Amino acid sequence: MSTTTQSDAGISREIVVIGSGFAAQQLVKSLRKLDAEQPIRLITADSGDEYNKPDLSHVVSRGCAAAAMTRQSGSDFAEQQRIALLPHCPVLGIDPVRRLVLTEQGEFPYGQLVLATGASAVRPELPGSEHLVTLNSQQEYAAVEGAIQQARRILVLGAGLIGCELAMDMASDGREVTLLDLADSPLSALLPATLTQPLQQALRSQGVSLQFGTGLARIDGQPGDGWRVTLTDGRTSEQDLVIAAIGLRPNLALARGAGLAVERGILVGDRLQTSDPHIFALGDCVQWQGQLLPFLQPIVLGANALARTLLGTPTPLALPPMLVKVKTPRYPLQLAGRTQGEDLAWQCRWNSHGMVAEARDQAGELCGFVVGGDQMSAAFPLLRQLPR
């Protein structure tokens, strides 16, 4: 177990990481591969247990209990990686002048600090919003696991990537599921409506009721008695569970409190350095080159680059074209590159079980693509053709 180590100048050599999600743990692993002795401290408000977050979209079809999702306990992870772990230790603030992390268990000096504070599920502001359920962590799932098991009528608010996955999963054992979105089609931030038609058909064939072009206005009722939901178009229905899947909002409170530059996320440069030269950020909380990147591959690549930077070899983050996977088993999708824009010309090949759609710019160059259904094997050859 590591202990705080002081340099000759009296400044801690310890790399302190706040958070224990995928980004934090991936960074620890990357650091350890490069340096077996570097002192590392992980501070987290939860247990620090490792689990696979994408599994949260498939808990019904896989019969997955919350406790069974744990791959490795926080204490075992700390022992394996030879780090100091402070579980169940909320961080109260950061003092960047004295280079201290302030917690309920004391003050901890750092040589370099990494914020891996993640993002929280967005909750809409409407009457009864406290009755909404979110599934953005193992802890959130554990809190509502019983309610999910008992629910027969479920409304999923938000038809983005996670909402579509959840709706198909929740309907996999015959439940009455409604998928609701203000947009006119699912995955509206990712794809033109035409390319989502096969997915819509697959959702309907699973028994999902698609309600587009309308939103949620209010939720009324009492726990245990079901919920009466009212839509913005005035229609009402009775539901046992209402799940919010309308996106994530980076957790910025600690960064703001420390005076770091933030916009939608914590602003970082190419080396994932914040506006403070001794503080870095990684994962869902980060805004890099104007983008939020709440996907696993950018985190893995970011952790590898940041580990080298923290250990003395400044390494900019470079992201190649990356696949986004929509894990809807009845009609899976993979996409990459630029897939939205009125200037795109689409060339589509369809069959009864799948599609390949290529997006080309005004010069006729491939700039994005979508593959669906039984055409998954076309993804990697197209990915290699995208400009880097």
From Swiss-Prot:
EC numbers on record: 1.18.1.-
Entry-linked NCBIfam families: PRK04965.1
InterPro entries named among the record's database cross-references: FAD-bd_OxRdtase, FAD/NAD-bd_sf, FAD/NAD-binding_dom, NO_rdtase_NorW, Rbx-bd
GO cellular component: cytoplasm
Principal place of residence: cytoplasm
Similarity comment: family membership: Belongs to the FAD-dependent oxidoreductase family.
GO terms for MF: oxidoreductase activity, acting on iron-sulfur proteins as donors, NAD or NADP as acceptor
Catalytic activity field: 2 reduced [nitric oxide reductase rubredoxin domain] + NAD(+) + H(+) = 2 oxidized [nitric oxide reductase rubredoxin domain] + NADH
Function: One of at least two accessory proteins for anaerobic nitric oxide (NO) reductase. Reduces the rubredoxin moiety of NO reductase.
Keyword Oxidoreductase on entry: yes
Protein name: Nitric oxide reductase FlRd-NAD(+) reductase
EC class of the enzyme, as a word: oxidoreductase
Primary gene name: norW
Recorded metabolic or biological pathway in which this protein acts: Nitrogen metabolism; nitric oxide reduction
